[in-house]
Amino acid sequence: FRVDAPVAAGAAAPKPPTELLDYGLFGTLHLSRPAGEASGTVLFFSDRDGWNERQDRLAGALAGEGAFVVGIDLPTYLRKLAGLSGKCSYPAGHVEEVAHWIERQEGFATYTYPLVVGDGMGATFAYALVAQAPAGTFAGLVTLGWDGTLRFAKEICAGDAGAMSAADNGAYRVVPVAHLPAAWTPKPFASGARVTGLLADVRVAFDATGALIHPLASPEARADLAATFARWRRNEDAEHVALPDDVADLPITDIPPTKGDAHRIAIIITGDGGWAGLDRGIAAALNADGVRVIGFSTLKFFWHKQTPDAAAQAIARVIAHYGKTYPDARFVLIGYSFGASLVPVVANRLPDAARERVDGGVLISPDDEAVFEIHVGDWFGSTHHAEAMPIGPEMQASKVPLVCVHGADESDSFCLKPQPAHVKVVALPGGHHYNGDYAALGDLIARNLPTRNRPAK
């Protein structure tokens, strides 16, 4: 993360126009649009008193730098969150869903991972939110001020980074995690921001990631926040790695192995959250075992409706590109959840030349059906779609060996149904997320990667 230097004051800006839109748990969303095409999405959480003119002006400054800003009234959401059933709360899922929905509503050409901003109590909430989410869910975090008095009615479910809430007199307070899953720009003393509660609470949270606390003397909060967003966009652009022309239009991430000569290449077809925590955890384990990983984001590829053949053609292009670069490499297709159900569908439709390079497929917690478009709202329960393709017949027809992995707690797993002889079924402790032990999941996959005899030359 970064602690930014102060920015000189600018002229006072008029209150920008804000569009209001109702959305379920979040009540009224406050939308601030850029003049042209958005360069990124910002999810902005208000302070404890709700969305007001201060946040309107800050959102307007962000929009002036090209951000599409979704303003969220924190008190409204916290009231509705407290009324939900369940032992613990998972706000990261709710917020990810609203990000997907609003970008689909706005007609974004592809999904862009949002930057999360919080003001005052919204800063403390935003920290807990990003700490809970799998790595890759949010592009980054900016906190203005801090409010150590934030309390949740229920425990916040632990995420991949561990617990971020602790019991406190019948409620739950935010506690720091050792490693935040996204880049954090803390501005504890930004102009106009509140720091409430013991300063030690703030220091503990910031020290957890090695930050140094010092006051920022920026006299103009809007200019400072706008400049922070602009710097963040520049950093994102600078970190982007250009892909070769023949695969430049595909949503792939290339991760070389930490050892070995890339004689095995795994194409990971992600879950519907895109290149995130579980997929990255598997990639790390495979990398350590000498496997090159190509992550294929279903969130981006299936943002618009595709066909089974189009999906197979995209994977065939990946195989062709890396197969040319590494002529002795063998490939395996690995998918999780949404992506797992696509593995047999894609494998069965690959051109012969591509399929001959594929040793097999691994399905991690597959659904019974494969679908070919991201449907907003599917993140909170299985939904049948008319265009869905049952994968049972695809498994039966597979010309490559398959491994079906499920959590021992997934009593309704597709893997537990009768499977053909060429499908190996493997169980691991936990449910759909495998208790967050992605290293164990990755190690299991590495040990069970399918193999085939090389075709005769």
Where are the language model's segments positioned?
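Primarily recognizes the serine-hydrolase "nucleophile elbow" in alpha/beta-hydrolase
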Residues: 103-171, 321, 329-394
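Short, surface-exposed "cap/lid" segments of acyl-processing enzymes
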Residues: 34-67, 71-74, 247-291, 295-299
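Cap/lid segment of the alpha/beta-hydrolase catalytic domain
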Residues: 73-90, 272-274, 297-313
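The feature captures the conserved acid-bearing segment of alpha/beta-hydrolase catalytic domains
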Residues: 33, 148-205, 371-430
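Post-His helix in hydrolase/transferase enzymes
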Residues: 88, 216-238, 309-310, 436-448
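N-terminal cap/lid segment of alpha/beta-hydrolase-fold proteins
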Residues: 3-37, 215-261
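Alpha/beta-hydrolase active-site loop
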Residues: 84-109, 113-114, 128, 305-326, ...
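Catalytic histidine neighborhood in serine/cysteine hydrolases
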Residues: 3, 70-71, 202-223, 292-295, ...
